């Protein structure tokens, strides 16, 4: 008959300081619950005794410990971990009773809570950081699928262990432990064929009783139940807005159930087909993890969670196959540990386990992702020396106040999309938040991994363009010159009696009107050009001045007319030249007056009127020599043409959606009538009022 024995070693204590009275432990693939408490791979409650009555928590808690199991004096199993809890019980004549809880070093991550951002890292890389921060270096990954790098991954107000479980479950990773002398190794895998396998098969004994030298399994129950038969996930990416990202995965081994149990979910938390297909399969594996299970009991201490084994000698040949241990509970009793105070019972060991067939993949339960309660405040960041930093999509980098690891530069976040007031295909509104601006950040579906800027706010340093509340009636759009001093502005003053639209261009102001431009000014217009003005009218110009017209030219004035110049003056036409007036006609010059025509120079004159022609001078010379006087001749300058305005690029042609009657714009005829109505003196557009009435 086999003999069993248990012992425990605790870091810093002499061997055999403690003896094992009994233990009750649980192991599981990834996390589970044991006696109402979280079990992170394994958790053992141990009843101990010692002839030392003054052991303290300082000597026990957070120390490494190792439970050893012997069969026929041979070490067959060990459990290595750290002491999470320690308590002292009754003090007897020879022994003091103690209890301790043995857990993996991984449980230390449950005592850390954080918020931080990981960028451009895979899940194994992120998990490695979490483990190494706690001094855990005994870990390994055995993965069949390469995890895709995550652009932006946030640990948001959650413990390190919850964050680890969440990421691992998303990628289909489960963990278990390999126990060796003096250490335990955390082992991540994503497929059952990556798990270790016991070297020898374990026999099944349905009629077992008493104690046998050979370990065996008994009480095996196989269970089949209907589960989800199909998973369909969907998501969206702004980089491929027309692509559905729909992924569908069908279950296998469905002969015993209906195939119409579809599980649809969106968003699927992926942005490409590779991840979408993998996540869909992982979801299906999880939802079907209880479709084929088995439970049983044994006295084989080599059975551990995360191991595979072959069963043999079962009466049902289908059961003699490979199995994966999903979870197992161990119980051991050692009454003889108390020696003279102990009972006469033998040392015992047994376990109860749950299994899945070896070809199936066990998936951990997906952990709920932290939800952001509402919008957050962040600051736009970028490289030193830059004022505006964005990518081709108008996205910017931001820094959250809670991100204590950020340096407040372009590495602080991923590229974050910015909501704009209007966004179409190459048309709409665009205003890029600048470095240092405070923005309001929302999160798609409350997901901290998907921030989007939905607003901007002023604060004590970034103040409004005008002081408040003094200028509370102003609506302002003011920009700031990039890499310089100055601003552009369009503002509206709405104070009664002071209403105003103000436009300021720091440098140039260009306008391009493809058709008509109509302006009606009810009062004065003032125009000051501090340098040159150039105007070109390619067809006709009509100018009507119903009062006076005054022009002051302080230097020369040139006018060149390609055709005729005709002027009609209702009263007088008076020209006053300081030195000379020169009239020249290429063919003929006619001066005509209704009553009188006078030519006067140097005290002499010629006067023509109804009474005749009067010539008066100191001397009148007819054909007596001399020559005609000459004028200066034409010296006018040609007008220069104005600069053109570059036309904005026309949006690329796109296929427009069908327009319903309720979406139709007003008819072109109505627009034309409105323009004509605006040319009239009425203060209200009669055509507009008519349209409202209809």
UniProtKB/Swiss-Prot annotation:
Stored InterPro entries: Gp5/Vgr_OB, Gp5_Vgr_C, T6SS_RhsGE_Vgr_subset, T6SS_Vgr_RhsGE, T6SS_VgrG/RHS, Vgr_OB-fold_dom_sf
Localization in the cell: Secreted
Cited function: Part of the type VI secretion system specialized secretion system, which delivers several virulence factors in both prokaryotic and eukaryotic cells during infection. Forms the spike at the tip of the elongating tube formed by haemolysin co-regulated protein Hcp. Allows the delivery of the VasX antibacterial toxin to target cells where it exerts its toxicity.
Regions that span the bilayer: none
Major subcellular site: secreted
Result of knocking out the encoding gene: Mutants are unable to secrete VasX.
Record-level GO cellular component terms: extracellular region
Top-level taxonomic group: Bacteria
Keyword terms: Secreted
Designated name of the protein: Type VI secretion system spike protein VgrG2
Originating organism: Vibrio cholerae serotype O1 (strain ATCC 39315 / El Tor Inaba N16961)
Sequence similarity: Belongs to the VgrG protein family.
Pfam families per UniProt: Gp5_trimer_C, Phage_base_V, Phage_GPD
Lineage per the UniProt record: Bacteria, Pseudomonadati, Pseudomonadota, Gammaproteobacteria, Vibrionales
